[in-house]
Regions:
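Conserved N-terminal segment of class I S-adenosyl-L-methionine
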Residues: 2-264, 291, 321, 392-395
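A short glycine-rich, Lys/Arg-flanked "PGG" loop and its adjoining helix->strand segment in the class I
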Residues: 288-300
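Acceptor-substrate binding/catalytic loop of class I
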Residues: 325-341
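Conserved catalytic loop of SAM-dependent methyltransferase domains
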Residues: 354-378, 390
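Core SAM-dependent methyltransferase catalytic element
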Residues: 373-402
Length: 402
């Protein structure tokens, strides 16, 4: 539903040359928005082949005409009014009144125009409105965010930290927040996989890729794996990246896909031998409830593999948010953790720490250079007073159920 609404808005708003490029991908479509939304809801080979062409086009647009491209959380982009209209419909009357008072405008069109031109107002909006979205609103927005990239995050940390372990594991694994399903594909070479995600568009993508891999499809599937590798960029050379040929040649185990939230899993107690949850926890409404569910469905001795952004990742995020004036938290990161808070949350729910590894490092000089651009001067002074050699923006951790 939200995708068709978005494409209707988008195709009516972009310039003629850009619209022509989108029409060329589906030359026979009479209702272009409905046709695009339909293809994003399907899990067949034709839909995946279309998505590859779509992402090739959108990547070019981001480079050549960023104001016309599909971008989330960018105030000078053509999609910005759509997100404002959506938020205006779902927030409370009290929140609408606060926005009217802060902007000095009554109409959402005028409010949107004020937000586009006023950095301070956008920062206020993010802090007062955009940072308190409901879980359902996050799920819906993620349907559109999924249009920006084919992959869904977590591929690098999976390949670097989890993939070497998976090759020695047995049993059933839960891919919690599976996204476009890259980790699912790889893990299914060794384990029975149950994959859950709340984003229907990405889940359909994962289902299609799994089906293509099982059938040994050799035309489109290798293009998909190549695209994921390209989206990883230089990070792909820092870890063992399985080739499409290896995945197609392997014997895939059973994979089951479920659309839903990982804070309410449809599995019995002690069902899984391991859980993979990468680049997910920070996007959720209540991380502790998710850890409780993991404890319920995991066998004693089973392990959870998890990544999460750190306190310094939060600082970097807040700096960029204040510089750009985003109306939502950057990347929709709602939570950040340090080793103590992450481990404490798992220990409260019956886990013990196996390892916590910081990664994604930035030198202190680079970090401070970013901070200097921020309007938040108090933050800059606080950082100057407590220098480090380098900072880690993310954590990889393994916890074992007692």
């Amino acid at each position: 539903m939200i995708l068709e609404q978005f494409f209707n808005y988008y195709f009516q708003s972009i310039d003629g040359d850009t619209l022509k490029k989108y029409r060329e991908l589906l030359p026979g479509a009479t209702d272009l928005a409905a046709a695009y939304a339909d293809l994003f809801s399907r899990s067949d080979e034709e839909a995946i082949a279309f998505l590859l062409d779509f992402h090739d086009l959108t990547a070019r647009l981001r480079q050549e005409k960023p104001e016309q491209a599909i971008l989330f959380n960018v105030h000078n982009n053509i999609c910005f009014p759509f997100f404002m209209e959506y938020i205006w419909k779902v927030i409370s009357k009290e929140e609408r009144l606060k926005i009217k008072e802060a902007s000095g405008k009554e109409d959402i069109i005028e409010i949107t125009a004020r937000l586009q031109e006023d950095l301070a107002l956008r920062n206020w909006f993010r802090q007062e409105i955009g940072s308190s979205l409901s879980q359902q609103d996050l799920f819906i927005l993620n349907e559109i965010i999924a249009l920006q990239n084919f992959s869904s995050g977590g591929e690098y940390s999976f390949l670097k930290y989890v993939y070497p372990l998976v090759q020695r594991m047995q049993g059933r694994v839960l891919d919690a927040g599976c996204g476009a399903g890259f980790a699912t594909l790889v893990m299914s070479q060794f384990l029975t996989v149950h994959s859950v995600d709340a984003c229907k568009a990405r889940l359909e993508r994962a289902m299609a890729l799994s089906s293509m891999m099982k059938k040994g499809e050799k035309k489109t599937f290798p293009r998909v794996i190549k695209l994921i590798e390209e989206e990883l960029g230089t990070m792909a050379v820092q870890c063992e990246f399985p080739s499409a040929e290896d995945l197609l040649a392997g014997t895939s185990r059973e994979v089951t896909f479920t659309e839903g939230s990982i804070d309410s899993l449809p599995y019995k107690e002690s069902y899984f031998d391991s859980i993979n949850c990468l680049d997910v926890l920070e996007h959720t409404y209540s991380p502790e409830e998710i850890i409780k569910e993991f404890a319920r469905v995991l066998k004693p001795g089973g392990r959870v593999f998890i990544t999460a952004p750190t306190r310094y990742g939060e600082v970097e995020q807040r700096i960029w948010e204040s510089i750009e004036g985003t109306i939502f938290p950057a990347m929709l990161h709602m939570h950040h953790f340090d080793p103590q808070s992450l481990t404490g949350m798992f220990k409260r729910n019956g886990f013990k720490e196996v390892e916590v590894v910081p990664f994604d490092f930035m030198s202190w000089e680079e970090f401070l250079e970013i901070a200097e651009k921020s309007p938040a001067r108090e933050l800059v002074e606080e950082l100057r007073a407590h220098p480090f050699e380098q900072v880690a923006l993310q954590l990889f951790a393994v916890y074992e159920k007692r």
